[in-house]
Amino acid sequence: MGSDSDLPVMEASFEILKKFDIPFEVKVTSAHRTPEATHSFVTDADARGCAAFICAAGMAAHLAGAVSATTLKPVIGVPINGSLDGL
């Protein structure tokens, strides 16, 4: 997720993953504010055997693009409604 404010939108997906016993991690990282941390997290997750990434971010939603630039694994981008309503 791009910020803590994205958490309420993503909680439903966490419940679905739990229901199907799919292991997952939750991490707040920003493609803009913490690009090095984002890169490190994705690289480390790849090394731990992560199968896919679900990236939620509001406003410009560049997180999914930043993650997909770092991995060959599937990346699902979840747009979060921001204060500009997509403008």
Language-model regions, residue ranges each:
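Short glycine/serine/threonine-rich phosphate/pyrophosphate-binding segments
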Residues: D6-E11, T34-A37, A57-A66, L84-L87
